[in-house]
């Protein structure tokens, strides 16, 4: 019979692999344990001992109201990104929304579950990450339709106009990536983190092409590196955007760039 020490990490792991809250796991600690859950627990503990991030080890990650499947096919959702969703939900309603570089699908699914959009299109260039996003669509089963399209950045969005385009693109340089902790570099997908010599290749491309895809007064919302607010604002102005706001994340760092399409951008 499996003996769990019920230290904080033990409880967290058991709760995650068994689909319970930590409180529920504690209350049911003396109940017989299903062999398949025991196997998941032991596998997760072995992975944690090797330095695998907690979310990957247990195969689950929370994001806003969602409990999602997660593995090394996509980045682990970050709490900072939840704030990006907040800003979009406050400013955009109805119509089509798009999520660029969806990864696990956390942004797209949050927009579908919490927002009032008619439909959400999620774009992902990695076939493996796109498959994970589809798994999470099946898991969450949002009432608002979510469609995953494979392709790079804005290309799969052609042929429609969007009320909101949201993106958490890669935004690090190679040097910044090299300075990350081993728990990130050894396990999370590099291509979801690094974006050219200045870290802005993906952001630059989205700023250059998004206006043509937005409805009048449509919203572009980007997560950005905290060190690049001024650079992103300059890129936006160079791309013809006339309204750009930079907002702080929950840690007080400039993290979100919001641009609204005006008549000038529609010319």
Over which residues does each language-model region extend?
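Non-catalytic nucleic-acid substrate-recognition regions in nucleic-acid-modifying enzymes
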Residues: 1-9
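Helix N-cap/coil-helix junction residues
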Residues: 6, 20, 142-143, 241
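Conserved AdoMet
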Residues: 12-87, 91
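General small-molecule cofactor/ligand-binding pocket signal
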Residues: 69, 147-149, 245-247
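Conserved SAM/SAH cofactor-binding pocket of Class I
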Residues: 80-179, 205, 227
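Mobile active-site "lid"/loop adjacent to the S-adenosyl-L-methionine
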Residues: 171-202
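Conserved Class I SAM-dependent methyltransferase catalytic core
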Residues: 197-260
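Flexible, glycine-/basic-rich loop-and-beta segments that form/coincide
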Residues: 262-267
